[in-house]
C-alpha cells in the first residue's frame, strides 16, 4: 500500500505539470531534488503514477467526477489494483467507494471519444477530422502507451550486429528495428547509459522514426550538409555517420544550451566532420553566408510535438499557439531553402500529427517556390533498403502502424536551372 505522503506528492507534481509550462521530466527532476529524503522505490511510485495520470487523464477525471489532482491520482490507483479500503487507509478523503463502483462498471466503449482517446478537446476535434474516428482512436490509444527504447548504432565505430552482440554480453539483449538498418530496440527501460558500449560511443538513444528522417536526406561523403534546427544533435550525429565522417555537417540552432549538450555526444561519437553554429534567427548572417552553397539541408522544424506523446504525455495538456508555430515553420523553411544549391536536396520534417504543420506548410512553400519539386519518399526508402511503402510522396510514420513516434517528412529537390 502506498504511503499517504506519496499520494500527496503525486498529486502535487501532477498539478504543477498540467498548470505549468515546463516539461514533465524537468519538473520531476526538480521535485525529486527538492525531496532528497524520498527513496528510490518511492520516487518510482510517484513517477509511474504521475506519468500514468498524464497519459490517461481524461479517463481518470471521468472516474473521479472532477479534475482535482488528488482525485485523479486516486482514480489511477483504483484502475491499477487498489481497493477503496486501501485508499481510505492512506487518509484519502474523497469518494473512494463511489469511484471504485464507477471503475467496476466502466465500459470504455460507451465513453465519449475524447475520454476514450484521452485527448484534450482541441486534439479530440482535430484528429477525427483528419484521420477519421476509428483511425484517430487507434492512433490515440497507441500514443498513450509507453514507447520502447530505440538505439541508433554509430556506424563510424561499429556495425549493428557487433553492437547487438556486445550489449547482450553486458546483459542487455536487443532486437534489430524493423525499418532502420542501424537501429536496435529494447522493450523495457534499463540503464543503457551505464554500459561500456554507450561510454565508447557505439550507440545513441534515438527513436527509429527519427533515424529514418536522416536517411531521407541521403547525404554523401565530402558534401556540405546543414541540420537547420539541430537541437541537441541526434540527427546531426546520424548525418555525420552517414557521411562516413567526411565532408561537413553544420549544426544550426538558436539555443546555445542545446548545442552545448551536443558537444560531449560529438566527442563520444568520434565524429570530426560536424561544426556547431549558434544563430540568432533564421536570417542570421551565419546562415546567409552559405546561401546557394549547400548540397543538402534538413529542417526538423520546431513544432507542437504531438507525435511524441508516448514519451511526452504532458504536451497534450498545454495550450499551443498553432498560428505562431506554423508562421515560424514557414519562415524557417524559406530561409533553409535559400541555402540549397541547384540539384541539391531539402527535407522538411516535424514530429507533429497535424496537417497544418505538415502538408499545408509544404504546399504553401511549393506554391511560391516552383524551383523545388517533391521526391517520393518510397523511392528514397527503397534505395536505403528500408522495407516501407508510402501512399504518397511524404514519409508518414505512426505508432499504431509502425511502432515509432509520429513523424512527417517531405524531400524536395532544387532544379538544376
For the regions a language model picked out, list residue spans one by one:
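Rossmann-like S-adenosyl-L-methionine
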Residues: 161-417
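Class I Rossmann-like S-adenosyl-L-methionine
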Residues: 1-194, 293
Amino acid at each position: 500500500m502506498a504511503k499517504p505522503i506519496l499520494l500527496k506528492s503525486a498529486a502535487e507534481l501532477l498539478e504543477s505539470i498540467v498548470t505549468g509550462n515546463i516539461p514533465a521530466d524537468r519538473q520531476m527532476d526538480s521535485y525529486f531534488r527538492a525531496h532528497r529524503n524520498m527513496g528510490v522505490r518511492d520516487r518510482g511510485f510517484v513517477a509511474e503514477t504521475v506519468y500514468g495520470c498524464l497519459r490517461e487523464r481524461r479517463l481518470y477525471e471521468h472516474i473521479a467526477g472532477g479534475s482535482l489532482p488528488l482525485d485523479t491520482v486516486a482514480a489511477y490507483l483504483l484502475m491499477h489494483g487498489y481497493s477503496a479500503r486501501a485508499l481510505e487507509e492512506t487518509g484519502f478523503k474523497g469518494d473512494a467507494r463511489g469511484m471504485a463502483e464507477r471503475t467496476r462498471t466502466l465500459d470504455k466503449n460507451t465513453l465519449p471519444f475524447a475520454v476514450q482517446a484521452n485527448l484534450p478537446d482541441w486534439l479530440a476535434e482535430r484528429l477525427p477530422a483528419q484521420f477519421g474516428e476509428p483511425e484517430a482512436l487507434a492512433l490515440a490509444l497507441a500514443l498513450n502507451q509507453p514507447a520502447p527504447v530505440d538505439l541508433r548504432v554509430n556506424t563510424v565505430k561499429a556495425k549493428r550486429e557487433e553492437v547487438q552482440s556486445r550489449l547482450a554480453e553486458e546483459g542487455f539483449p536487443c532486437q534489430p528495428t524493423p525499418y532502420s538498418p542501424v537501429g536496435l530496440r529494447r522493450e523495457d527501460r534499463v540503464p543503457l547509459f551505464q554500459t561500456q558500449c554507450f561510454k565508447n560511443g557505439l550507440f545513441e538513444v534515438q527513436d527509429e522514426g527519427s533515424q529514418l528522417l536522416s536517411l531521407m536526406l541521403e547525404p554523401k561523403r565530402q558534401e556540405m550538409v546543414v541540420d537547420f534546427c539541430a537541437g541537441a544533435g541526434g540527427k546531426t550525429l546520424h548525418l555525420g555517420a552517414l557521411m562516413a565522417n567526411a565532408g561537413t555537417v553544420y549544426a544550426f540552432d538558436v539555443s546555445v544550451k542545446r548545442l552545448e549538450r551536443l558537444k560531449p555526444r560529438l566527442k563520444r561519437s568520434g565524429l570530426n566532420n560536424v561544426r556547431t553554429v549558434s544563430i540568432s534567427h533564421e536570417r542570421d548572417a551565419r546562415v546567409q553566408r552559405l546561401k546557394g552553397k549547400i548540397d543538402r539541408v534538413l529542417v526538423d522544424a520546431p513544432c507542437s510535438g504531438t507525435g511524441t506523446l508516448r514519451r511526452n504525455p504532458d504536451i497534450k495538456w498545454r495550450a499551443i499557439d498553432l498560428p505562431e508555430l506554423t508562421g515560424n515553420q514557414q519562415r524557417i523553411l524559406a530561409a533553409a531553402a535559400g541555402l540549397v544549391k541547384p540539384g541539391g536536396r531539402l527535407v522538411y520534417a516535424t514530429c507533429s500529427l497535424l496537417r497544418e504543420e505538415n502538408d499545408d506548410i509544404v504546399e504553401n512553400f511549393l506554391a511560391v517556390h516552383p524551383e523545388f519539386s517533391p521526391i517520393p519518399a518510397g523511392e528514397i526508402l527503397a534505395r536505403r533498403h528500408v522495407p516501407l511503402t508510402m501512399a504518397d510522396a511524404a514519409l508518414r510514420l505512426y505508432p499504431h502502424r509502425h511502432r515509432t513516434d509520429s513523424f512527417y517528412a517531405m524531400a524536395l529537390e532544387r532544379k538544376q536551372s
